[in-house]
């Protein structure tokens, strides 16, 4: 079995329980020393064989897989969450082609870690309900589909998380302030370098100071930039509709007149929900059933 495990943003105790279990049971681990702290390997057993992928090509990694049969427990340890810029699809394709069992163990993304360190919610009602994850094209421009980069998404003014772009601060600032951008020079930014590592840096600034702020960190990799009005450090006057006294859910009725206290609804079965604006449950149809995906 080959497990693509998300290591989380850095701190060894931010790997998931399942990820730690897979590391503890692994016969072989492939990890990138340039992106994942060595402390993550403390979760491994004493007999594990470790390969550092920092100097390996895809072909080198696949050769390690091919050298072991399906009974060998292999962990490919990726930084953050494997589904985000993890280059795992080409490895999954190999598993399909060679009839190998595999799984993805999700990890805590650096985006989540960065927002936690910034101390801000990324989706503030009435400010932004959308988070865009993107990057500058850079040396891998061929991988970037047309009109899907930073400048294109800047037109919407949503909260943006820009990864893999710290080495080009002037280009990043220019795209964020393009002629069609909804961002302003005073739009808040937060730069997070090596989130949850011992030497992490958190820098609050604005789009107008972003290039200088990035250069001041000295970082050219493992840095993430958050952009958007949701990052404003002033107290927001907006509030969630979900917890508003007048809002009804499957578990809470709208509050009594003159009161803001919650009013529990009657016990409902897992197949029931409440229609918006009504105090009665409705049965979900068969096409609304939630099921777990089948593991590969």
Q: What is each of the regions a protein language model found here?
A:
Residues 109-113, 119, 222-223:
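Short alpha-helices
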Residues 2, 60, 64, 72-74, ...:
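A contiguous loop/helix-start segment that scaffolds small-molecule binding in enzyme catalytic cores
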Residues 1-113, 211, 274, 295:
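Class I S-adenosyl-L-methionine
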Residues 47-49, 120-125, 179, 207-209:
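Short, hinge-like loop/turn segments at secondary-structure boundaries
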Residues 115-142:
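Short, glycine-/small-residue-rich phosphate/pyrophosphate-handling segment
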Residues 9-10, 79-80, 117, 126-128, ...:
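Residue-level signal for pocket-adjacent positions within structured domains
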Residues 42-43, 117-118, 175:
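Residue-level signal for well-ordered alpha-helical positions
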């Amino acid at each position: 079995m080959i497990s693509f495990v998300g290591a989380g943003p850095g701190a060894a105790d931010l790997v998931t329980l399942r990820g730690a279990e897979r590391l503890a049971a692994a016969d072989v681990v492939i990890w990138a020393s340039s992106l994942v702290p060595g402390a993550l390997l403390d979760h491994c057993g004493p007999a594990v064989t470790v390969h550092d992928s920092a100097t390996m090509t895809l072909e080198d990694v696949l050769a390690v897989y091919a050298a072991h049969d399906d009974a060998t427990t292999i962990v490919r340890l990726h930084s953050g969450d494997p589904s985000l810029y993890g280059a795992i699809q080409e490895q999954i394709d190999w598993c399909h082609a060679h009839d190998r069992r595999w799984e993805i163990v999700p990890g805590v993304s650096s985006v989540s870690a960065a927002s936690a360190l910034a101390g801000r919610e990324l989706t503030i009602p009435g400010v932004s309900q959308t988070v865009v994850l993107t990057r500058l094209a850079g040396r891998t421009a061929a991988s970037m589909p047309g009109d899907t980069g930073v400048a294109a998404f800047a037109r919407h003014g949503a909260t943006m998380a820009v990864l893999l772009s710290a080495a080009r601060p002037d280009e990043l600032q220019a795209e964020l302030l393009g002629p069609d951008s909804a961002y302003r020079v005073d739009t808040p930014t937060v730069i997070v370098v090596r989130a949850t590592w011992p030497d992490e840096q958190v820098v609050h600034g604005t789009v107008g100071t972003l290039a200088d702020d990035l250069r001041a960190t000295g970082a050219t990799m493992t840095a993430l930039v958050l952009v958007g009005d949701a990052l404003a450090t002033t107290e927001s006057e907006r509030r969630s509709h979900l917890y508003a006294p007048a809002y009804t859910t499957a578990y809470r009725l709208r509050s009594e007149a003159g009161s803001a206290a919650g009013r529990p609804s009657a016990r409902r079965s897992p197949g029931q929900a409440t229609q918006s604006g009504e105090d009665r449950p409705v049965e979900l149809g068969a096409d609304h059933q939630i099921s777990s995906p089948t593991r590969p």
